[in-house]
Amino acid sequence: MRSGVIAQKLGMTRIYNDAGEHVPVTVLRLENCQVVAQRTVEKNGYTAVQLGVGFAKVKNTSQALRGHFAKASVEPKAKIAEFRVSPDNLLDIGTEITAEHFVPGQRVDVTGTTIGKGFAGVMKRHNFGGHRASHGNSITHRAHGSTGQCQDPGKVFKGKKMAGHMGQVRVTTQNIEVVSTDVERGLILVRGAVSGSKGAWILVRDAIKKPLPDNAPKPAGIRQLAKEKTEMVAPVTETSEVEGAE
């Protein structure tokens, strides 16, 4: 089990595939995503990595977090989150994960917080049909109707759909396809919509219901390995200068 990543939602756009069809995608950005702490079986009873992403001003960071980031020798982060991993996929502190962590065609599970809608009625919140528009009905056109039975059981059961706060809840969308990645700009393009507003922090993990592609990097797509791969592909040019030549 590999680590997930923390990405920032930039918005939606569309790209064209080889068949000329446009594909709606959500653009997620990885910005300085580094490991800031480890969790081991010997010390914590489980194996995990704590990731930090983004940049935060020192004056806006608490004293406790300043010491936490200083211990890891990383800059203060805007967002931190923890991901369970298997012991063989444990990453060293300070390791930076890039967009190469995911490969095109891979399925991922995306977790975000939906946009808050405020207080909403049952017709908007739960898609109720409402009451009659006329024929003796007044005031209760959009009411939810009965909330339960009679003296027995004499209560409203938990989970009864009523009016209330809509949105602003944590939602995980499973099996979203990774359309493409841009390692240089740290972008991950996933098919379709992702819960959350623009600028929201999104957690992206390998799909638990789909197999991991064979070409997915293990233990992770880290910055150093990505740099070495680029150097291997780039042509090598040799230049020599003779000092003091006349």
UniProtKB/Swiss-Prot annotation:
Keywords: Methylation, Ribonucleoprotein, Ribosomal protein, RNA-binding, rRNA-binding. One of its GO terms (cellular component) is cytosolic large ribosomal subunit. The keyword Ribonucleoprotein applies. One of its GO terms (molecular function) is structural constituent of ribosome. The modification N5-methylglutamine is found at residue 151. GO terms for biological process: translation. The keyword Ribonucleoprotein applies. InterPro entries: Ribosomal_uL3, Ribosomal_uL3_bac/org-type, Ribosomal_uL3_CS, Transl_B-barrel_sf. Methylated by PrmB. Part of the 50S ribosomal subunit. Forms a cluster with proteins L14 and L19. Belongs to the universal ribosomal protein uL3 family. One of the primary rRNA binding proteins, it binds directly near the 3'-end of the 23S rRNA, where it nucleates assembly of the 50S subunit. This is Large ribosomal subunit protein uL3. It comes from Bartonella henselae (strain ATCC 49882 / DSM 28221 / CCUG 30454 / Houston 1) (Rochalimaea henselae).
